[in-house]
Amino acid sequence: MNIINLGILAHIDAGKTSVTENLLFASGATEKCGRVDNGDTITDSMDIEKRRGITVRASTTSIIWNGVKCNIIDTPGHMDFIAEVERTFKMLDGAVLILSAKEGIQAQTKLLFSTLQKLQIPTIIFINKIDRAGVNLERLYMDIKTNLSQDVLFMQTVVDGSVYPVCSQTYIKEEYKEFVCNHDDDILERYLADSEISPADYWNTIIALVAKAKVYPVLHGSAMFNIGINELLDAISSFILPPASVSNRLSAYLYKIEHDPKGHKRSFLKIIDGSLRLRDVVRINDSEKFIKIKNLKTIYQGREINVDEVGANDIAIVEDIEDFRIGDYLGAKPCLIQGLSHQHPALKSSVRPNKPEERSKVISALNTLWIEDPSLSFSINSYSDELEISLYGLTQKEIIQTLLEERFSVKVHFDEIKTIYKERPIKKVNKIIQIEVPPNPYWATIGLTLEPLPLGAGLQIESDISYGYLNHSFQNAVFEGIRMSCQSGLHGWEVTDLKVTFTQAEYYSPVSTPADFRQLTPYVFRLALQQSGVDILEPMLCFELQIPQVASSKAITDLQKLMSEIEDISCNNEWCHIKGKVPLNTSKDYASEVSSYTKGLGIFMVKPCGYQITKDGYSDNIRMNEKDKLLFMFQKSMSLK
């Protein structure tokens, strides 16, 4: 039996989970069709998902149709959970991108499709909610060709709420024959030579084009009224093909971790090659760690079943492997989809329990949530001692707050959400602290040179010190100290886009230790950073704004107020497309404003595009290291020189 892994993707509220539930029901995997409104869906299994009607975590289920086993991964539709969606992309053989017939192409729709297109993932577009009043399919078709791709093939026509095929294995319209010829040279040559080409030949060529992500079939339906679901199942089993297995050696990728109500850790793996068997002893990440598979499940027709073996391209579930982390692999390192640029959160908030004595409980709960979702980053501010969480947005914050209260029985308060800035040195500087020169209490001399690098370059560390003079353990201690120092600059933000060179060293044998070098490094780094000064960097968003032409003047005025950099404007009689960059801090709510002043027609699509020097006169009241007496003494001694 062929096995495929299919992602269900959509902008929030396009009907993604409802379509998934209908696929389960129509294929016989469930006895009734779950409804989001009723809170009885299979894929949204978390209480908070059922109650709020949104998908928070990617969930996996399975159906069988036309002899094909299809593992369905239902992904979040909200931008705040984009990291969860990105992890899903790595394991997909194909995708169904769902559009709402009434709302059409929305910001998340375009972002998802551009990623699918970039990664060359075979994709079926499904227009949902065709039953709604006011649907204008012809206008939507134009929008799809304008904003998604010209390479779409509309497989059906819609008449009075029902769908009818216009392209199949036995029948194809003449204009569709031309479409196929324009996309395939072999068919074109046969067509020009007047060779006989059957509908099946065209159909098989379409399948091959879809598999190569060169053509995107478009289908229609309504999950609410079970319209077009069987046709969608047929398309999935026809157009989405399993990958060819390249090896019999085990290779498995861990893409999801969850904990059941009893606290058991459940790990979900995609078997890339080979097979995983009960009682196998397998290596994790090519390390010296081995685990024994003591239990093994897979997903079959919407439910989990115990098995002795899970084969290539299928999903395996194992329990109570404490060493597992998302992104780990078993056996050979898997070849996964490349080209994803991980989006780091650009917002943060301090969180504290309503009862101060429950702080350790909050930390433990957050650690469990981090195991399930590695994009959840939290830390303890070493100066304020506050617990800080990095966030993608307000909805994620609300979900975390609810999970802490309902799942871990601890109530917390979040402070105001703030933008995460970064710091970069302004100029090249060199700083040295000498051994046995007060107030240096460490048996070490360290010299560091700091110099700014281009934006986006990150941290680079080099050493001018010979390992013949100062061995690896001492130099590694300096490198650790540099990385630790970069976590908090003059204003408390991460220091980035700089090169740090270890330029001078002296030690006394046998009294000097790596710890001396590790502990002195932050003081040298700090003094050098103070001498250089820092630029404050703010997160930027690359945006595409599509609006009716009548709203273009307002849009340009708005973008100027948001301190954006407009890079391109193109307009026709009806629409304007504007591209550029805008600070995250000024544009957090602009998508909803666009929807308001364009009556839902406008799209403001953004994606992170690095940092730039802030333009808004950033200032704060943070004074780091005020209680560090040794730093004060270093500063005083340096000022006397």
Swiss-Prot record:
Family matches, as InterPro entries: EFG_II, EFG_III/V, EFG_V-like, G_TR_CS, P-loop_NTPase, Ribosomal_Su5_D2-typ_SF, Ribsml_uS5_D2-typ_fold_subgr, Small_GTP-bd
Listed GO biological process terms: response to antibiotic; ribosome disassembly; translation
SMART domains: EFG_C, EFG_IV
Domain tr-type G: 1-244
Entry keyword Cytoplasm: no
Coiled coil: none
Matching Gene3D superfamilies: 3.30.230.10, 3.30.70.240, Elongation Factor G (Translational Gtpase), domain 3, P-loop containing nucleotide triphosphate hydrolases, Translation factors
UniProt-recorded Gene Ontology molecular function terms: GTP binding; GTPase activity
The keyword Protein biosynthesis appears for this protein: yes
SUPFAM superfamilies, sorted: EF-G C-terminal domain-like (SSF54980), P-loop containing nucleoside triphosphate hydrolases (SSF52540), Ribosomal protein S5 domain 2-like (SSF54211), Translation proteins (SSF50447)
Alphabetical list of PROSITE patterns matching this protein: G_TR_1, G_TR_2
Keyword annotations from UniProtKB, A to Z: Antibiotic resistance, GTP-binding, Nucleotide-binding, Protein biosynthesis
A Pfam cross-reference name: EFG_C
Binding-site positions, GTP: 10-17, 74-78, 128-131
UniProt family annotation: Belongs to the TRAFAC class translation factor GTPase superfamily. Classic translation factor GTPase family. TetM/TetO subfamily.
Function according to Swiss-Prot or TrEMBL: Abolishes the inhibitory effect of tetracyclin on protein synthesis by a non-covalent modification of the ribosomes.
Name of the protein in its database record: Tetracycline resistance protein TetQ
Organism field: Bacteroides fragilis (strain YCH46)
Lineage, uppermost ranks: Bacteria, Pseudomonadati, Bacteroidota, Bacteroidia, Bacteroidales
